[in-house]
Amino acid sequence: MSDQPHTLRYLANCSMLFTEEPLLERPRAAAAAGFTAIEFWWPWPDNPTPSQEEIDAFVTAVDDSGVQLVGLNFFAGELTGPVDAGVLSIPARSQQFRDNIPVAVGIGERLGVQAFNALYGVRVDDSTPQEQDALALENLGLAAEAAARIGATVLVEPVSGPKPYALRTAADTIAVVDAVRAAGHDNVGFLNDLFHLANNGDDPAAAVAAHTDKTAHVQIADYPGRGEPGTGELDLDALLAQLQEQGYDGYVGLEYKPTTTTTDSLAWLPTARRA
C-alpha cells in the first residue's frame, strides 16, 4: 500500500489482531501499537448473556486501555467453528439474539460504541428462506430500536466461506438494509467488507460505486488469503480512496489474519495513521 492515498482512519479488530494476548489484554496491546480505536466480535461466543462480573471485566479492560470501542458484534455463535455465522435469522436460535440485544447495547452505552454488527446467519433445512428473512427483519428492527436509544447504528454485512451464509453479495445485503429502513429504522447500514465481497466473486469496486451512500462501516483484509494488506491482490488503496471520494468518512476496520505476529503484520501502516 502506498503512503497516503486517502485519510481514512484505521482501527484494530481485536478478535482477529493481537490474538497473541488473552482477550482482556488486547485493548491494551492495541493501544501500545498506537491505535486509539478498536472493535470486537462478541467476546463470549458460547453465551449471549454473560454474567455481570464478566461484562464488568471486559468494560474495565477497554476503559483502562484508553482506547475507544467503536464497534461490537451482537452474539453470533462460534464464528471460528464449522457452523455458526450469526443467529438472528434462525428460528431455533432467535431468542438468543433477542436476549443478547439489551446486553450488547448495555455494554455499548457504557463504552460509547457507535455500531453493532448483526451477523445474519446461515440457511437452515427446517425453515424456508422466506421465513428466515421475515424473522431477520423483525430481529433487526428490535436491534435497531435498542441501538437508537444510545445513538448507535446496526450493521449488516456479506460473509464468504463454506458456510451457507444467506448474504453473499453487496446486493443481497443492501436489500436487507433497505427492508429494515423501509420498516422505519434509519439507523441500519451496510458493512462493506471488501475481503468478503472479493472472496465471494462480487466486485468490491462496483459495490463502492453503488452503495457508499448506505455504507456505515468498512472492514478490510487482502484477497486471497485474508492476510494483512500487501499479501494479496486487492488494490485496497484504490478502493479506500474511492470510498472517501464518494463521501465515506468513517473508520476502516483491520479484520485480517496476520501472516506473522500482529506487530510485524502492521509494518505497512505508519503509527501516525492508526486511529
Cite the ranges covered by each PLM segment.
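A generic structural signal for short coil/turn motifs at secondary-structure boundaries
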Residues: N47-P48, S127, P162-Y165, R226-G230
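A cross-domain feature marking catalytic cores of carbohydrate-active enzymes
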Residues: C14-M16, F40-W44, L69-A76, A118-Y120, ...
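Short C-terminal domain-edge/linker segments immediately following a structured domain
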Residues: F40-P45, L69-N73, N100-A104, E145-I150, ...
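Active-site acidic/histidine proton-transfer and metal-coordination neighborhood
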Residues: D3, D64, G81-G189
